[in-house]
């Protein structure tokens, strides 16, 4: 038997109708009717946003069901309460603004759609629904009237006043607000109003501000003529203020224009100085003529406009700029780069820029000195030029070209500087020290004609100059020593001494000052050992090819000869050098400087011989058969036994000399070189047959005898032979015997090592 659903307001009993249902957790959820069972009076309710497994059958008359739109019912109830209130046009109400708050407003009109046109107290007009308007209480209406008296410029228009006055007031307030926004910044506090107004009118008005103020003044004059709006602008000081402002603005404008002109002239002056320096460095032969003429004309004109100067200084500056532009780029490329570094260093050392441009007192090449001063002056700013430039006359371009040609002819003709000039160069200020030193180095290059040494000119090298001009203060001391060294020796040694001075200048500029010893021979020798070997300058290993006796190095020590590099030698020559180096170590253990130079070479040779010999051993050991090796070993043992028996009495005789020799070689330098030499001697391949030849050092390793001439031909041993003048005695018999002992000991060690290597290979 079917039942009828009950009449419940807000709930429609249809499939898909929405309502709220209470679940078993006693919470209300929006739900929907899925099915209706009319026989039992139940409904299948689905909770929205939940799974269908939570669907539940609920009786339609249960308290767990209620209508979904209960707030709407409340609004309807409020409407019912306020239906009796009826608003009229011109009535003061509380209207809702966009921030959901209610503000006092006035109803302008009632529209047919049921909306109200409302105007707020600030002049904004809106259309609102009935629900967004409330009636204003009586107390609030009185407060609104008090506000009218406090702010007369924003007076509220009541029903008594006509509608036109209200609109005019709103427009005037809007214009005033626009003016405040355009002209002034927002005010932070009422106390600083006067200060900010003064600042505002002190500012220079732009074109936009002038047009806006003029339009505002026109509007204000029009509104003053109207009788109704004349009282409303009592609080606005708009008419009087701009007239005062424009009077002050004109004075400030003129003042600012003057300051801007001064700043622009200063900027132009700095730009001029930069342009003159850049043109001097980048002058090209083709395009340079036009730029030079333009700079000649513009430089003195701008200098006259900037500041009143004496006529002498203006002429000097004009001559400086013109002569700096006429200089050729080949000369300027070397002088400009050095001038910047030197001017910076002078400012750091002396503290005042006038010390940088003092002319040197030396009589050396006055044209060169003028070139240096001109380039330096063109790089410095004009303020420094005004302080430092004296009223001395400068050469014209023609005389300058003439001096250049004369200087070139002097360079080609003489190619040398006097000794006095070299000594005087070190005396001037620190500005020109580095430059004069570089010039003297260039002049020395033309003198040097050593066949094995290739010189490059300083101009061709470009950026990689060997002279570091930032260290010009260090250059002065070695110059004086070299000049005195040059005066001591006659002209026959000029080529060698000049090469030494050129090298020492390189060493000085790299930070390594060459030490000068008391004896001239030690001075020359130390320079050869300490100077760096560059691509253009390489010192040979030994001295010349000539075969000289043990007195080849004279007591004066001034002759310095250069030899061709030693040719590559075969495997047997390496063995010969092993023995020679062992004996040389014993002879010349006192010569420390030579040892230091040879030490690295000996170690490199030992490493190369080890690799070469080890590879060759493996190849030969594979080719040999076991029988031949055994026979060879037996022969070697027999030879050793024979020589031990024959020379056994010599060992007891020379024990003391060998001990002295070991004590003498105990220094760290000789120890390291000796160890490398013994290793080299151990790495030789074949066993030795001990023969005592007629010469001192003709010991054979591979069955080939060495003659005296072949030994003395070696350049490495010849350079190490000591002269009789230094030691005043020749090698005695004890030294020769100790040498023989040393060679025999090294041969024994070599044999033991070879045997051990063969055993390891097997």
Swiss-Prot record:
Ranges of compositional bias, category Basic and acidic residues: 193-211, 614-632
Region annotation (Disordered) ranges: 178-231, 289-359, 383-411, 536-559, 613-651
InterPro entries according to UniProt: Agenet_dom_plant (IPR014002), KDM4-like_Tudor (IPR040477), PHF20-like (IPR043449), Tudor (IPR002999), Tudor_PHF20L1 (IPR047405)
Keyword Repeat appears in the UniProt entry: yes
Coarse class of the protein's main subcellular location: nucleus
Domain of life: Eukaryota
Electron transport found in the keyword field: no
Polar residues compositional bias, start-end: 319-340, 383-398
Protein name: PHD finger protein 20-like protein 1
Gene assigned in the entry: PHF20L1
């Amino acid at each position: 038997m079917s039942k009828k659903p009950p009449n419940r307001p807000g709930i429609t009993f249809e499939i898909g109708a929405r309502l709220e249902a209470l679940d078993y957790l006693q919470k209300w959820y929006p739900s929907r009717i899925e099915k209706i069972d009319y026989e039992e009076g139940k409904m299948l309710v689905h909770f929205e946003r939940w799974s269908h497994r939570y669907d539940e059958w609920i009786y339609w008359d249960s308290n767990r069901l209620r209508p979904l739109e209960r707030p709407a019912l409340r609004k309807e109830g409020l409407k019912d309460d306020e239906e009796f209130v009826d608003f009229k046009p011109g009535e003061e109400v509380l209207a809702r603004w966009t921030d959901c708050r209610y503000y006092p407003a006035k109803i302008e009109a009632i529209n047919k759609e049921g909306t109200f046109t409302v105007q707020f107290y600030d002049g904004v007009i809106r259309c609102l629904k009935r629900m967004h308007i409330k009636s204003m209480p009586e107390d609030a209406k009185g407060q609104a009237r008090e506000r009218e008296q406090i702010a007369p410029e924003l007076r509220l228009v009541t029903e008594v006043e006509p509608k036109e006055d209200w609109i005019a007031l709103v427009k005037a307030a809007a214009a005033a607000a626009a003016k405040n926004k355009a002209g002034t910044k927002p005010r932070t506090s009422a106390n600083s109003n006067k200060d900010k107004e003064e600042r505002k009118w002190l500012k220079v008005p732009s074109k936009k501000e002038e047009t806006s103020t003029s339009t505002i003044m026109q509007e204000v004059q029009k509104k003053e003529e109207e009788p109704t709006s004349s009282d409303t602008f009592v609080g606005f000081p708009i008419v009087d203020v701009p007239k005062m402002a424009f009077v002050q603005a004109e004075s400030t404008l003129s003042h600012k224009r003057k300051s801007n002109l001064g700043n622009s002239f200063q900027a132009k002056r700095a730009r001029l100085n930069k342009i003159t320096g850049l043109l001097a460095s980048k002058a090209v032969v083709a395009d340079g003529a036009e730029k030079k003429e333009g700079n000649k004309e513009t430089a003195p004109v701008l200098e006259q406009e900037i500041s009143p100067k004496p006529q002498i200084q203006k002429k000097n500056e004009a001559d400086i700029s013109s002569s700096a532009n006429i200089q050729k780029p080949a000369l300027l490329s070397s002088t400009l780069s050095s001038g910047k570094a030197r001017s910076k260093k002078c400012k750091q050392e002396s503290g005042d820029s006038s010390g940088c441009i003092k002319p040197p007192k030396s009589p050396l090449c006055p044209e060169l000195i003028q070139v240096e001063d001109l380039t330096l002056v063109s790089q410095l700013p004009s303020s420094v030029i005004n302080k430092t430039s004296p009223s001395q006359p400068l050469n014209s371009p023609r005389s300058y070209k003439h001096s250049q040609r004369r200087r070139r002819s002097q360079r080609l003709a003489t190619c040398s500087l006097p000794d006095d000039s070299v000594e005087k160069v070190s005396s001037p200020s620190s500005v020109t020290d580095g430059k004069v030193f570089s010039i003297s180095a260039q002049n020395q290059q033309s003198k040097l004609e050593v066949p094995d040494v290739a010189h490059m000119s300083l101009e061709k090298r470009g950026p990689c100059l060997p002279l570091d001009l930032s260290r010009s203060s260090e250059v002065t001391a070695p110059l004086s020593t070299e000049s005195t060294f040059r005066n001591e020796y006659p002209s026959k040694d000029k080529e060698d001494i000049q090469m030494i001075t050129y090298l020492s200048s390189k060493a000085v500029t790299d930070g390594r000052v060459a030490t000068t010893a008391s004896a001239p021979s030690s001075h020359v020798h130390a320079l050869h050992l300490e100077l760096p070997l560059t691509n253009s300058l390489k010192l040979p290993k030994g001295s010349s090819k000539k075969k000289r006796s043990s007195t080849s190095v004279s007591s004066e020590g001034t002759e310095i000869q250069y030899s061709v590099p030693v040719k590559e030698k075969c495997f047997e020559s390496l063995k010969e050098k092993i023995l020679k180096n062992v004996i040389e170590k014993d002879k010349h253990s006192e010569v420390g400087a030579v040892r230091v130079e040879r030490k690295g070479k000996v170690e490199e040779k030992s490493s190369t011989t080890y690799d070469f010999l080890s590879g060759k051993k493996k190849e030969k050991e594979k080719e040999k058969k076991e029988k031949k090796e055994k026979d060879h070993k037996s022969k070697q043992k027999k030879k050793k036994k024979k020589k031990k028996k024959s020379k056994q009495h010599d060992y007891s005789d020379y024990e003391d000399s060998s001990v002295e020799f070991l004590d003498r070689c105990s220094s760290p330098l000789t120890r390291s070189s000796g160890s490398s030499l013994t290793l080299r001697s151990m790495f030789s391949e074949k066993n030795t047959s001990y023969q005592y030849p007629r010469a001192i050092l003709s010991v054979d390793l591979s069955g080939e005898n060495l003659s005296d001439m072949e030994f003395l031909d070696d350049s490495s041993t010849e350079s190490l032979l000591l002269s009789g003048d230094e030691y005043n005695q020749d090698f005695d018999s004890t030294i020769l015997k100790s040498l023989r002992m040393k060679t025999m000991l090294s041969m024994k060690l070599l044999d033991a090592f070879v045997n051990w290597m063969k055993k390891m290979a097997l």
